[in-house]
């Protein structure tokens, strides 16, 4: 899911509400993978150690909750990828650090994701990524051993979690990386530049 536009808009509203100038959407996009931490860092230069961080984090969540399906879409090719997975009778799921407070409405708004065999949110397990627990929970819900799973992610934490869970790992360059990260250095088993590249990997598996 490409939620960067709504993430950025929620953070930018916090700036304009305070009389600060709006920032271009492109400024927020590379930080979308870091969630509220990334958005507040870009909007205000704020880190979690700031005394006002928790209050602004909740304000960001409230802003995002009111508009999280306005501009959010799936990345190009994801719809076709899911259709192909279903035709090949391959199970798939979603593991995210986002709270169920956000993931459940998003899933409801996007019928395509009703075909997911598992959905693991930030509070589904005691630990979030990069801990392997959420990925192991997803594998359990799918009825699969971890070594029969491939985890695709666009953040270094995703690959760390996948490797720790004993899964095949694929780094995706089409997410929010920008020029701030190098997925070739993450230690993933493979790197893809578009969702449909995953089909080619599966054919070789």
Please state what every model-predicted region is:
Residues 1-30:
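Active-site neighborhood of HAD-like aspartate-dependent phosphohydrolases
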Residues 14-15, 35-50, 106, 138-139:
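Helix-loop "lid/cap" segments that line or gate small-molecule binding pockets
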Residues 23-27, 51-52, 114-118, 146-150:
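Short acidic capping loops at alpha-helix termini that bridge into adjacent secondary structure
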Residues 41-80, 88:
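Metal-dependent phosphoesterase signature
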Residues 66-94, 100-108, 132, 160:
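Short, acidic loop-to-helix structural element flanking the phosphoryl-transfer center
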Residues 111-119, 181-202:
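Structural recognition of alpha->loop->beta junctions
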Residues 129-159:
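Conserved Lys-Pro-Asp/Glu-containing loop-to-beta segment of HAD-superfamily phosphomonoesterases
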Residues 150-190:
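Acidic, Mg2+-coordinating phosphoryl-transfer loop and its flanking beta/alpha structural elements
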């Amino acid at each position: 899911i490409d939620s960067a536009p709504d993430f950025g808009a929620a953070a930018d509203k916090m700036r304009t509400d305070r009389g600060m100038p709006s920032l271009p959407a492109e400024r927020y996009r590379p930080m979308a993978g870091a969630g509220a931490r990334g958005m507040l860092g870009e909007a205000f230069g704020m880190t979690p150690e700031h005394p006002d961080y928790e209050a602004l984090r909740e304000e960001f969540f409230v802003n995002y909750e009111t508009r999280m399906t306005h501009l959010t879409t799936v990345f190009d090719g994801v719809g076709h990828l899911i259709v192909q997975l279903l035709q090949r009778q391959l199970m798939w799921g979603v593991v995210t650090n986002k709270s169920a407070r956000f993931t459940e409405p998003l899933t409801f708004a996007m019928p395509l994701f009703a075909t997911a065999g598992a959905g693991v949110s930030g509070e589904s397990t005691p630990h979030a990524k990069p801990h392997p627990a959420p990925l192991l929970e997803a594998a359990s819900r799918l009825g699969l051993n971890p070594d029969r799973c491939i985890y695709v992610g666009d953040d270094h934490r995703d690959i760390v979690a996948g490797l720790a869970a004993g899964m095949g790992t694929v780094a995706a360059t089409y997410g929010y990386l920008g020029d701030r990260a190098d997925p070739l250095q993450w230690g993933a088993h493979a790197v893809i530049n578009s969702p449909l590249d995953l089909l080619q990997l599966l054919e070789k598996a």
